Regions:
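Residues that flank catalytic or metal-binding motifs in active/ligand-binding sites
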Residues: 24, 55, 93, 109, ...
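N-terminal anchoring/stem segment of glycosyltransferases
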Residues: 5-84, 101-102, 156
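A residue-level signal for conserved active-site and pocket-lining positions in enzyme catalytic cores
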Residues: 59, 97, 112, 152, ...
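A short, glycine-/small-residue-rich helix N-cap motif at loop->alpha-helix starts
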Residues: 82-92, 180
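Amphipathic alpha-helical segments that form well-ordered structural scaffolds
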Residues: 44, 48, 52, 96, ...
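GT-A fold catalytic core of metal-dependent nucleotide-sugar glycosyltransferases
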Residues: 67-70, 75-81, 92-144, 154
Length: 192
């Protein structure tokens, strides 16, 4: 991830002020579902993040209940929604907002993210905001403020209303209405 991404992060505001304890490990997550990516992507992402951050990390893997997850990874079993395929599995990212699976600050990366330099600056961002990379399809359109969900930083306890909103709707209706998870996130957490 290059330094320009730092300038392309959008923030979405809430009412509490919070920072990560500098002495605590950073909680980092990824999601692997179905056969779109093999396990080597998890290992590579873990390696990249570990090399490019100075804090110790806890690495969380959100995946199917029956998928084995070796140490040192922390497994979170996803609810099986029966969705599969390379363009549908991204809907499982909505479960990252379920604070019953993990509660607290969480830095999320898609499995195909490449981290190339130090990312310590991310954990210093104020957690009263929801932080995500700006949607790269619209980088040259300054009026567009939508996010790309490939890199996100937030406190799951403060944004669990996203999960509750997803649960309150019919999943098939959501999938048919929105192009992908980030469109729904953009609607539920409007840019401040």
């Amino acid at each position: 991830m290059d330094t320009q991404i730092k300038d392309k992060m959008n923030k979405k505001q809430i009412n509490t002020s919070e920072f990560v304890d500098p002495s605590s490990p950073l909680d980092v997550a990824c999601l692997i579902h179905s056969d779109g990516y093999d396990w080597s992507y998890v290992d590579k992402l873990y390696s990249m993040v570990s090399r490019h951050i100075t804090k110790p990390i806890n690495f969380h893997v959100y995946t199917e209940a029956d998928r084995p997850v070796p140490a040192p990874y922390i497994k979170h079993s996803l609810i099986n929604w029966g969705i599969s395929g390379p363009k549908k599995s991204w809907w499982y990212k909505m479960q990252l907002f379920n604070s019953d699976l993990y509660r607290g600050p969480l830095l999320y990366f898609d499995l195909d993210t490449v981290v190339t330099e130090n990312i310590d600056w991310i954990w210093k961002l104020n957690l009263r905001h929801f932080w995500a990379v700006r949607d790269f399809k619209y980088l040259w359109r300054p009026h567009w403020t939508g996010i790309n969900s490939s890199v996100m930083w937030w406190n799951t306890a403060q944004f669990d209303h996203v999960w509750r909103e997803v649960q309150s709707r019919d999943l098939n209706t959501i999938i048919n209405r929105y192009h992908g998870d980030q469109d729904l996130i953009n609607e539920i957490i409007p840019i401040a």
